Amino acid sequence: MKIGLEMHFQLPTRSKLFCSCPTTSAEPNHNVCPVCLGYPGSRPSLNRKALETGLGIARFLDCAIEERVWFSRKTYFYPDLPKNFQITQYESPLGTNGHFDLNGRRIGIWRVHLEEDPGRIRRVGRSGEEIAFVDYNRSGIPLVEIVTAPDLTSPEEAREFIDQLVIELRSLCGLEAQDEQSVRVDANISLGEERVEV
């Protein structure tokens, strides 16, 4: 079994990635502005603290730091993404080819990059009769995405890797990994057989 992880961590900044809206919790749709809602003519301004924190994480993971990076728009059509695109560094990461040591084994880090968090959908009601509410307070909060090589060999090892990385990031940059909103992980699992998309 081979497991690679795509981990998204909310960065502990006071404002969002491209605007001055606060990242603290508030009543739904209170911490929003034309920039994080994607209004035409609004002008984003990069959060320096988020960039510095992302670079610090990439350096900590011993990544090769790129001399020039940029952001691009990744198009999605979801109700929790008011702009219908996510601003990301997917094509131009802060760092590549790093590693994290876990129990004497080196786990490869393919990439570290910044991107915006989408909004949050909350469903209320019984199954089949649900009503969906969208809260855009989270939209635009800075995320760092860390993508590992498929070097993990079991679900238990993957969980231990995440736990250890969270401990290190708490110490390094004050990461607050307290709930499912601040840390989200996707696992890519290969059983060594023919590839099947699920």
Where does each model-flagged region fall?
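Basic, nucleic-acid-interacting segments
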Residues: 1-198
